Each structure stands twice: as structure tokens, then as C-alpha cells.
Amino acid sequence: MLLDTFAGWPSYWSMVPVEDYEDAKALIFEGIEEEYAGFIKKCDDYRSKVQLKAEETLKALDEKGIDFYIVSKYNFPEMPVHENAVNLSDGFTSVERQSFGATCADHGEILTEKYIKSLKDTKYLSPDRKIDASTCLFPETSYFIKNMYHDTFPAPINNLAIDLMNHDATVSGGEFVQYVLYDGSDELKVITGLDEDGTKEKEPFYMVFVRFFTAFFDFVKKLIESKKA
């Protein structure tokens, strides 16, 4: 059944976390590797040439002077069907993954005083104390939007993207605020304190499908674990 549906789609293999890829491949293709050699090669090529080299590729672009920006969304938990459901996310992808390394409190929590006091510089710390962008791969060009879901793109985020593309901006330069709030209006707001949540965006219908697919992948992971046992 898996091979006739999700496991037969390369796009879904591209979303398998790096740490789970080999186990998932062994579960699905054990004993039929030769029959699916072409498909496996396609997925392996993407993993080795794109997924595993993402940071290397971005660093190379940066060293060549090519400007780019990373915009992450947050203030939601991951889907409540797996062990990492408390991760701060956009409702689908953790902020850590989106931003290439931000340090985050769990959803509904803030970073501890001990952690904050350990920072040499707090300029990359979010005003709501949920995110520390100093650990990002590119802290100077990483921006965060609070209260916006994974696959929704209202006018404010599009306007921000256009503004970033038209400016040689950095966080230290002050052209744009690193942490902003989406409250459903036409403009992003500056986050000024701990309790400023605004009005969270209404959950889109597509989240029903996201929950289904997340549950499906969690089911596959459990199959892998049971096979190991």
C-alpha cells in the first residue's frame, strides 16, 4: 500500500528528516531494492546532492556575495502526534529547521533566565523571549513572523519579501526589525514584549490534510521502530 501511494512519490521522500531517511528506506524497500533501483537512486541523489548540502550551498552563496534572506514563521506547536509536538513551529515545520539553527523555547514557554544570562549579546533575542537567532546559520539575515501558519501567504509577508529583495539589509543595520507580529491586518507589527500575541490567524482548512499526513509519517516511523525491536 505504501509503495502504491506516499512511498512511491519522490516529493514525500524529500520531506523525510535526514536522521530517519535510511531507516525509512530499509523499511519500505528491503528485499525489492533492485526492482526500485531507479526510484531509490533519484531519492538518494536528492538527499546527497541537495538536502545534506543545504548549509554548504548557502554558505557558498554567501561567500560569493549573493544576498538572500531566511524568513521563518512561528508561535504554534508541531502536529500533536509525535514526540516533538512541543517544538515551536509554524504548525508544520519547527523554527529550528526553518531558520537553520535558531534556539527556541518549547511552544507556550520562554527561554530560561539561565540561558538568556549565558548570552554574550542579546541583540538576536526575540522580545517575547521565545527565540534566540544568534545560533542561526545566518543571524544577520534571518527574520521571524509571529502568528502566521506554514502555508499561508497574506499580503504582509509578500510585502516583506519584496522589501528585503530591494534592500541590502542586515539585522544590525536596522533597516528591518528581526521579529514582527502578524495580527490579521495589512501591516506587520513590531513585537515589544512578553505578552504580545495579537490575534492568531484563523486555522486554514489545509491543516486537516497536514494533520493527516503527519499522522501517516508518524505511523511509518513506528513501523520502523517495531521492526528494529
Kindly label every feature range from the protein language model:
Residues 1-229:
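Lipid deacylating catalytic domains
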